[in-house]
Amino acid sequence: MGVKKKKEMQVTALTICHQDLETLRFLADVEGKNLASLLLYCVQLTDGVSQIHYVKQIVPLLEKADKNGACDPIIRSCLDILAGIYLSLSVKNPLKKVLASSLNGLPEFFLTEAIQSFTSRLQEELNTTDLYSYRKVIDNISSCMENFDLGRAGVNNLLKNVLHFLQKSLIEISEENRKFAGNRIVQTQLMNDLLVGTRVSVMLVQKIQDIQRIHLKTSSSPTWQSMCGLLSIFTKFLSDDDLLQTIQSTSGLAVILFIKAMFHPPEKIPDLISSLLLRSVDCTSIPDWFLNCCRSLCCTDVSQSTLLFLCQGTLTMLDWQNGSMDLSGEALLLNIVHILFTLSSQIKESTLELFLSRILASWTNSAIHVLKSSSPSLKNSLNGKSSVVGRLLEYVYTHWEHPLDALRHQTKIIFRNILQMHQLTKEKSNSEVSGLAADHFICDLTEGLLRLEWHVKGKYTCLGCLVDYIGIGHILALAKTIPSQILEVMGDQSLVPYASDLLETMFRSHKNHLKSQALDSTWIDEWHETWVSPLLFILCEGNLDQKSYVIDYYLPKLLNCSPESLSYMVKILQTSADAKTGSYNSRGALGALMACLRTARAHGHLQSATDTWRNLVSSARIKQGLIHQHCQVRIDTLGLLCESNRSTEIVSTEEMQWIQFFITYNLNSQSPGVRQQICSLLKKLFCRIQESSQVLYKQEQSRSKHEPENELTKQHPSVSLQQYKNFMSSICSHLFEALFPGSSYPTRFSALTILGSIAEVFPVTEGQVQAVYQLSHDIDVGRFQTLMECFTSTFEEVKILAFDLLMKLPKTVVQFQDSEKLQGLFQAALELSSSTKPYDCVTASYLLNFLIWQDVLPSSLFDSLKTQQTACEDGDKSAIVVERNTLMVIKCLLENLEEEVSQAENSLLQAAASFPLYGRVHCVTGALQRLSLNNLQLVSEWRPVIEKLLLMSYRLSAVVSPVIQSSSPEGLIPMDTDSESASRLQTILNEIQPRDTNDYFTQAKILKEHDSFDLEDLNVSVQNIGASAEVKGKERKTCDVTAQMVLVCCWRSMKEVALLLGTLCQLLPMQSVPESSNGLLTEEQVKEIGDYFKQHLLQSRHRGAFELAYTGFVKLTEILNRCPNVSLQKLPEQWLWNVLEEIKCSDPSSKLCATRRSAGIPFYIQALLASEPKKGKMDLLKITMKELISLAGPTDDSQSTVPQVHALNILRALFRDTRLGENIIPYVADGAKAAILGFTSPVWAVRNSSTLLFSTLITRIFGVKRGKDELSKKNRMTGSEFFSRFPELYPFLLQQLEAVANTVDSDTGELNRHPSMFLLLLVLGRLYPSPMDGTYSALSMAPFIPFIMRCGRSPDYRSREMAARALVPFVMVDEIPTTIRTLLAKLPNCTDQRFRQNHIHGTLLQVFHLLQAFTDSKYRLNTYFQQELADVAVCTRAKLWLAERQNPCLVTRAVYIDILFLLTRCLDKPTKGNQPAVECLGFWEDVRRIISGSELITGFTYTFTVPGLPQYLQSLTKLAITTAAVAAQAGEQAGNIPISFSQLLESSFPEVRLLTLEALLERFSTAALGLGEKGLPPLQRNMGETFLMLAVKENHPECFCKILKILHCMDPSEWLSHMQRCIHLTPKEFLIWTMDIASNERSEVQSVALRLASRVIAHHLQMCEETRDSVAPTLKQWVQLVVSSCGEHLPTESRLAAAEALTSTTPFLLTSPHPVLGLQDTLALWRCVLTLLQSEEQAVRDAATGTVVTAMSQENTCRSTEFAFCQVDASIALTLALAVLCDLLQQWDQLALGLPVLLGWLLGEDDDFVVHLENTHQVEDYLFEKAEINFWAETLIFVKYLHEHLLRLLSTSSRRPLSPESLRHLRRTASEQGHLLSQLFRELPPAAEFLKTVEFTRLRIQEERTLACLQLLAFLEGKEREDTPVLRASDSPAEANQFTLAKTETAH
């Protein structure tokens, strides 16, 4: 919300040559009043901004001189100097424009002299011969022509010279560009010069052609010759593909412009250009000069780009307006568009595609201009039904989903222009309405667009254009629910911007329409109903994403359009806020209300905060919103408080109180998005405070004039300022308290981020600036130590935030007086940098950086460097201090590393166990990354350090490479479970030297051939390892080393070396020449680094190794491409050619690593190509792709297998690389061909690589999968769009598919000949026809359909299924019924003798998938839909034998039954005035006959070995369930039903029972939630007895689980009464049986049984006393069961069941005024609630929060808190639960018995502290065991809340609740624990918080618990805190004490 600071203007001061300076000195008068004096003073200034002031005084001074009527020599000389000054200024210098503007006002008297001066000076400029000065001259010519009269006059005077100069300069620059081919940096500058020169030539001719046409009349004139020369140059540029396309494009403009200027007569120009474009130039009829200049355009074939840019030039440079075009011009217009259509189908390059789209849009603009005064024939050619418009629309439909945003934008322009063109071709109509109704083009267009699916982005833009064109009325008449439809899709982020823009267009149009027709204000009701009501529905009921996007995109636009609608929305939401309170997954009306108010306030639709709180929303609602269970409600409420459209709006007292309340409970958010929003909103609030405080300070300063008042609080500014200070100080205190020991990662992240924002918003001020708050004032030693302690976090984000915050504090805050402490910190950092724990070195890096930047390194480090220190005292003190410190630390680390590498060279095992090497390297990299290495002052000292660093990196890499580059480092090193592993490691490390060769493919598996696997080689190698295991290592001491340690040491060392080398390349300046003094890296060192990366990328076999090298290599290549050193700049190109040659030659001796994915080779080439500048021609990419695609193609040469696999793998990597963007798209078609053909290879490696490449291409073409459905509409493309983007694939795919289809139906079904069918169907299945496809495309999808149908006859089951899925998108929705009938007709009759089940199955699958697509379409329920389905049903009945026993194949029977099932579902809908179509057709009789005759009734003779039996059972059961359900709903008698639910449940097949139970469970669940329309039918309602009997005898686990779930859903009163009669169990016995199941079964059944038992208990407890007493004895077992289900180690489902059990029994067991259970059991249940509230699982916490909400909403507890009946978050639910519990203890009068238990919770008696301490020592043995990582639960927060509530409880208690004996026991326990803690603190080493973080944190937490307990005990004894013998500071070591003292109050 802060106001952006205005960017300061940078103006370079003007200067003049020495001679001119002397002239001015000579001419200046003594008084300093003449022009020379003014100019002299001006040029002597060094500030350009000040000079502007004096430049503006020139003309006023000359105006005075003009009155004297003489132009004296002084002024003449000054004008000459001014001309020189103007031409010397750079084109971007603001002084140049200021000077031109001033001289434009020159008095007429001086114009002649001034023009002469400018002409003279410009002539001097034109005479220059220095090629690298040409650009400056060209810029000057350009400047003279732009709004500068003197300059334009000078150019006119020198036109001949100027043209000659431009011709000469362009020729010479072009030649220079050719010489520097390959030097990108120089070429970029030269091409830019060419571009500017071309543009200036165009501008020159445009601006002076009318004045200078006389020069062009004679062909011998120099001007004419120069023009011809320039035209020749531009023609050459136009055809030169080595130039930038912008140069070619501008040359196209220049060619047409020059032709227009030079060709006579002008009326023949359109014909001439037409003949040029159509390649039909008659060379005999054109002038010789034209033929000489444009011969390449007239007589040879031109490239696509040349033709394209000529079209662009024609449309831009010819005058299409004002009716200036005759019939030849109209013909040219039509010729251009047909050429563009042709080019559209040929161009593949993305940049040219973009050019074409812009040119096509430009063509539509020109067409509109011409149509305004065109001939009737042109209007006929361009009306809505014309072929041109049809093809334009096809272009729009094809490209409106294009990946390039700019191209999609052009389609919108084209579509909008098409509507305008159509409007201009229409005949005028008397009535707008009749005109619209009669306009078939617009009507068809509108209906076609509305028929499209909403996932099509182009639909939105085109509908928006239509609304602008015809208004909203017609569209609302066709689709009244369109607002709801659009809002429905706003859950998809990719569609949201399009949808919101369309909605805005629509509701604004609708509002204007209604207002224009209305007589009063009632129109707003209709507008609200149409646009606001759907919005409110989404806000209350929509899904999370949908609501968020609607609020962010739609709501602001709606309020901006109609601010008065806010009160309407608030009124509706206020009334429903109590009913719709929301939950953890629903915002409810309260959330919607907060979102609306937040948006309104942020956009300035609320007058002030005070009005908002008073009139629109209550304080209680605000607080509810701030702790609501739904995170977005909390965020929106916070946003309402923080955001304002006025950055200086004063923050009210209420707002500050609410913010404090919010921060208390919302720092610990697990969602990164929520944390980011909280921090962002609070930063906005702080900016408001900062900016409004400045306003208050100003008011305070002016109070002497009048008494100012705060507009909100009506109080003095000083009071508000003091409130601000108190508020900020309070916030910071709370944030520092949140960094307590054991605080979670989210809490620390949030607190540190907010503190960082405070430090940023309230910076340290200097001078007179008044600051309302400064964070540094609130930082003491304790808080400083707290921030330091954050470095020990296992999350690097926390370390970064803490470090950044410390860096923002002034150095005076950070005071280190104790040199021992400094030495200890430095030693701790060094120790951590060599720790065996991988995360310790990160802590070390931050510690060292902190010591470096704060200049607090121990003095002992500098003892050997006194001379350097004295030499560094000059210059920038702070920068050089940091540089010196960094250098010293790196030297220290290097010395240690050198020693350790030497030891590692002798024994890698010892290094891995004692000093893994990577930590030191990590710290070096960390130190270098924070230092600005481009302007070092100690260069001479850095050079040997860098050299040593490089050598050390290579040595270290050599030590670990044997492990990294071995064939299998993980496999060859034995696992830690082997007791002899440590002794065998060294021997094995010697065994795993790399022995990889390039013979990977020599034994490639060929299809239909089998290779035997010989175990002897493996046995020999195992024996060798075993024999060597006795060899002892040479280390002096025994190392406790594991295989994991060795691997981590080696892999991380390699990673750190790669990152270090990459960092050095990226940050260190390179020496441009060997003797250069400014660079640190020499050319030779850079090449060495490149060779290092090359070796690891090309020869490492493991992904981890080459990925690490890739990271550094990318940094190196990026630097090399920008390097001015030409030899270094060309290195990537040389490396690329070398590796491509090595891949092509396939030499067996090659060192390239050949694996199934080519190891690091693709990464290597990827890095080389991705670093190529994207703005160039991308020549390396083009050549490489050409080579790779030729290698990837099929080959008969077995020697080519390795290159083919490499090529396929490299192509895959390149297509995956997003950095290549659209530049890779032209090669997609060839890549797809290679992948599909490669899949047919007999070599497995080729097939494997082809599959991977194909998968990548599918993602590249159709996008990353964005839906659950494999063929999601979001990942599909219309056939026309696909084939227009990749036209080469049309004939290829069709040909391949035809080849497959022609052989797949043979008698033998030779599938193996065409394994590519799978890939073909996969591609085709992602295409679909669009209703907008026109008839103009030659790329029709129809030819594919018969071949896909034939593929359905494949003998392979998966292929038949894929063919069926692939067919669906090829058939238009309204053609599906016809296609289904055709397919059904092909099925055999029961009388046919010969038929193949594969054919039947394939056809039936196609019918099924087509029918499924049709029934899912939007045609549901209309008459057309029902009629078409009825016709399909008739055809289906004709082949009914396929579903009966006459068909022996169960697979085809199953599919046919699935078809019947679909039909019964869709036909069972009554049409208007008729009974359901199913009944009319007699369909149910057929279905019942099939079921009656099926094996479900007669029994099965099959076993599970019969193919298709499970599938058949499932299909038949689904149909039977539908039949039974329909009959039950209709109330039919049991005798009329072929099979009942009870019979299905008695089936011997579990599949049948499971499906039936699932169907019944769905119905019972719906009925239990009250979502059913009429409840359960009678036949289903009375099944309780059936389920009881099933529950007892069911053995199948899943079925048993479903039965228990159904019983849980049913009302227990419906079945408990039948229990004794049905299963002979009493309620008590049934409860025990259920709990036994919950105790013994697996987790899912256990959870369901616990829920069921809890529901039964709740039912009994609310019944009569006798029933209650019967279950009372079993409650203790139930309590134990619940307690055992709450452990954090248990599955989530168990804990969710426990939470649900607690919620259902809360009113009876947890909060009952008369407890049923004993106090111990009741408190045990409450402890369960508190445990679940601290779970790491969000779902568990939410469920437990439901228990708390229930608990505090009972009659006897609703006054315990202020949030009764509110949906609250788990963070506040914890304290609310404790509040309710303490209140209940008083109600029950059980304080004396309950208090010891609660004090035990406080002390942590349930956590065995001693066991924890013993386990701590074992932690050291595990390499990656970081500590008890907590993402949410915080022990001390629980302690804090419990302490607060117990203190409040004891304060309000009227009598002492505990006896002296109880007090003594508790005190003794706490005191013993305190003394143990003291002893343990003393045993810790110095800097324990860093070196022993886990133990230190655990001790600190226990210390806080002990202190809290002792304080309460002291309070109980009536003593003051000071008299309590608690743990004292002196009991802790000094190192721990500094932290402990600062944190004593944290938990209180």
UniProtKB/Swiss-Prot annotation:
GO terms for biological process: tRNA methylation; tRNA nucleoside ribose methylation. Together with methyltransferase FTSJ1, methylates the 2'-O-ribose of nucleotides at position 32 of the anticodon loop of substrate tRNAs. InterPro entries: ARM-type_fold, THADA-like_TPR, THADA-like_TPR_C, THADA/TRM732_DUF2428, tRNA_methyltransferase_THADA. This is tRNA (32-2'-O)-methyltransferase regulator THADA. It comes from Canis lupus familiaris. Keywords: Coiled coil, Phosphoprotein, tRNA processing. Residues 1924-1948 are annotated as: Disordered. The modification Phosphoserine is found at residues 1012, 1021, 1158. It comes from the Eukaryota. Pfam families: DUF2428 (PF10350), TPR_Trm732 (PF25150), TPR_Trm732_C (PF25151). SUPFAM superfamilies: ARM repeat. The lineage of its organism: Eukaryota, Metazoa, Chordata, Craniata, Vertebrata. Residues 883-915 form a coiled coil. Belongs to the THADA family. Residues 1935-1948 have a biased composition (Polar residues).
